[in-house]
Amino acid sequence: MKNLSRIFLKIGGILSIITGAIFAIVTIVFIILATPASTDFLLEGLKNGTVHTDMQGTPEQAVVAIQIMFLSMAICFGVAMVFEGLTAYFVLKAAKKETEGAYITAIVFGFLSGTQLPLVGAIFGLIASNKEQRKKPNPAIE
């Protein structure tokens, strides 16, 4: 069960790294679209009809609203990227340390990032460490 836990944690850590990289790319795209450099592109798209919105007002007001939305999306994906990075760090650390505290930390950050594979690996690790503790004699009883 320990080996299965270690495998799930390593695969989950790699998955978190890949997901974090994808979130970083999406964050960069939204930041670029939120800059004033993309104002002309969006304004031209609104006037030509290639960019469709149901917003009331002038196209200039719609561009400002769209850029605010892009900036808020960049912030959301940036936060998700940070959580994925932390998840990758703690999950790979849990695969290496194999302690109950590391497994619990991996469960918490796996839940916060939305990556399910580290959750399974950490739960398997907790079960395996609990079985190992039951096999050891308790010196307090003897």
Residue ranges of each PLM-predicted region?
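Perimembrane loop-to-helix junctions flanking transmembrane segments
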Residues: S38-A65
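Glutamate identity and glutamate-enriched acidic tracts
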Residues: E44, Q56, E60-Q61, E84, ...
